[in-house]
Amino acid sequence: MKKIIWGIDLLFSTSLVAGAHTCCHNSAQKCGCKRGYYTQYYGDKPELIKEAIAWAESGVWRNGFDKAKPHSSVNLADFYLQYQKNPQQWQALFDYLAKTDLLSIPKGKHKIPGSDLVVSVEDSKNEPLEKRRSESHNKHIDFQYVVKGTERFGVIDHYSSTPNCKYRPDVIHYDYDRRKARFYDSNPGEFFIFFPRDWHIAKVATDSEDQTIRVIVIKVDYKD
């Protein structure tokens, strides 16, 4: 069942994007299109999607890390392509996660041995959606693994979102339509990866009383 979910979610996401591209190229408001654009489009590359799903299911990327799998929202085609282009950083990342006690390590920033990656261990609290900012990055990929508590992540629609500030390395923020945003709650058995086309919101309050979280954040270089 886990394997099926991975594949269906990616294909569903890309089919929505395909509909949005067909309906309108510039703005959903111009044609009344209800579909959105949430992640990099690979719907015209079915073989790549199949290859990426098979690769993700095989676990060859794990490098000893078996505590979690990609959340169903993760764009597996992006994950697959970026891993092939930058294996050293990804291998170091998963090796670190496999060998580190993520619950007891002190909060703060730590260098990942054998790489130029830095892990940020954050003990934090979720906040109401209106207090959280959306963002995306051009040069880095956000790897986020919530090891304690539950964090709600949002992904916003490109067509109904507009930048509300100047780009400054390496982040830009957006005004967006909350009704078109998608939200996902974390669990310790899954991690999230936000690629440049995944405009996202982090640390959104959930429906539970306890909003305390520990999240592992690693910024991986994005390779064109």
Could you tell me what each predicted segment is?
Residues 1-43:
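Bacterial Sec-dependent N-terminal signal peptides
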Residues 35, 41, 49-120, 131:
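A short, N-terminal "cap"/entry segment at the start of jelly-roll beta-barrel domains
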Residues 112-116, 136-140, 146-148, 213:
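Short connector loops at helix/strand junctions that flank enzyme active sites
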Residues 119-136, 151-161:
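Conserved short histidine dyad/triad with adjacent acidic residue
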Residues 139-151, 157, 167-172, 219:
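Short, conserved beta-strand element in jelly-roll/cupin
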Residues 162-185:
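Double-stranded beta-helix
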Residues 185-204:
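Conserved metal-binding segment of the jelly-roll/cupin
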Residues 191-193, 210-224:
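A short hydrophobic beta-strand segment most commonly corresponding to one strand
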